[in-house]
Amino acid sequence: MTYKITSLAGDGIGPEIMTSGLQVLEAVAKKYNHTFEIESHPFGGAGIDVAQDPIPSSTLKACQDADAILLGAIGGPKWDNAPKRPEDGLLALRKALGLFANIRPIQVPSSITHLSPLKKEIVENTDFVVVRELTGGLYFGEPKHWDESAAVDSLTYTRAEIERIIEKAFEIAATRNKKVTSVDKANVLASSKLWRKIAEEVASRHPDITLEHLYIDAAAMLMIQRPTTFDVIVTENLFGDILSDEASVITGSLGMLPSASHAENGPSLYEPIHGSAPDIANQNIANPMSMISSVSMMLRQSFSLFKEADAIDAAATRTMQAGFLTADLGGNTTTTDFTNEVLKQIEGGE
């Protein structure tokens, strides 16, 4: 079968780690006899440079026509004063594709537990997923206004928006440890009261999955105190933005973690959680793990190529266990050498 993928390398370290990700994809294609048609297009600052737009029309069309999209990283000081910033392109892409669910898996490999800011006995065996709603809440609610004397943001959610994101969380939990933690502020916010009610309704349709509710402040504390207690966390846009970034710090490096954004229909977007890191761009020292893991996540969630995704994950784990660690993990392995070892492990693995 042929899979059509749009590659958006972006800015900063994006092109370097995208090269790593695509090399891994090519290795999988060769080993398991798949065909991946890859189209590369400018996006973010690179889009501004060539078309004065962070998401040129040709890039958007390629994304809409793809089976899945890989994104490296966007942004940098070069475009801080541009009429349209690189980040505007990502918001536009999410809207155009109808991406409503951001999925961020949080795992701490045993080879790097010492890098976590948490004690080893707290962080060991951490394995949970944050499911964040992307289309509603304070970021998009109207009215939205500010001037020198006052400002207003609106936290708005519809039943349909809440129900589909909570259903997505239960769908994911069904493939894991069958527990969903719904995070809200139902003791204060009207939107959270509706959120909690709908969560209970969805849970009633999934009797084999446990639902618990936590207020956002309690969830933020528990994530640090006992991260292993979580399986799938689901929450609204602002809370999800904060919690997913808090969760990412548990691993000790942003260079480790992938994410996925899903629509109800159409292609999904896979990307590392970190930024473009312009300070280390073009030095061959960026950690490509988050991009490699994004490729694995794409194979698993968009194409149901589970064996192939497992092969990538196992190869990356063996690479780190063998001592191939980039600078952010306390080592001195280059981007190229890390990638080459992963490729070697894929080729020689089961």
Swiss-Prot record:
Q: Where found in the cell? A: Cytoplasm
According to its UniProt record, what is one Pfam family this protein matches?
Answer: Iso_dh
Coarse class of the protein's main subcellular location = cytoplasm
Q: What is its EC number?
A: 1.1.1.85
Q: Which residues bind NAD(+)?
A: 76-87, 275-287
Cofactor(s) in the UniProt record: Mg(2+); Mn(2+)
- Cellular component GO terms, alphabetically? cytosol
Question: Where substrate is bound, by residue?
Answer: 94, 104, 132, 217
Supply the enzyme class, top level: oxidoreductase
**Which UniProt key words apply to this protein?**
Amino-acid biosynthesis, Branched-chain amino acid biosynthesis, Cytoplasm, Leucine biosynthesis, Magnesium, Manganese, Metal-binding, NAD, Oxidoreductase
Pathway membership: Amino-acid biosynthesis; L-leucine biosynthesis; L-leucine from 3-methyl-2-oxobutanoate: step 3/4
Marked site (Important for catalysis) residue numbers: 139, 185
Entry's InterPro entries?
A: IsoCit/isopropylmalate_DH_CS (IPR019818), IsoPropMal-DH-like_dom (IPR024084), Isopropylmalate_DH (IPR004429)
Per UniProt, Mg(2+) binds at 217, 241, 245
Can you tell me which residues the record assigns to a coiled coil? none
Q: Name one GO molecular function term.
A: NAD binding
**Cofactor note, please?**
Binds 1 Mg(2+) or Mn(2+) ion per subunit.
One GO term under biological process is: L-leucine biosynthetic process
Family to which the UniProt record says this protein belongs: Belongs to the isocitrate and isopropylmalate dehydrogenases family. LeuB type 1 subfamily.
Which HAMAP family is this protein grouped with? Answer: LeuB_type1
Please describe what this protein does.
Answer: Catalyzes the oxidation of 3-carboxy-2-hydroxy-4-methylpentanoate (3-isopropylmalate) to 3-carboxy-4-methyl-2-oxopentanoate. The product decarboxylates to 4-methyl-2 oxopentanoate.
Q: Give the record's subunit note.
A: Homodimer.
Name the UniProt record assigns to this protein: 3-isopropylmalate dehydrogenase
Lineage, broadest ranks: Bacteria, Bacillati, Bacillota, Bacilli, Bacillales
> Which gene produces this protein?
leuB
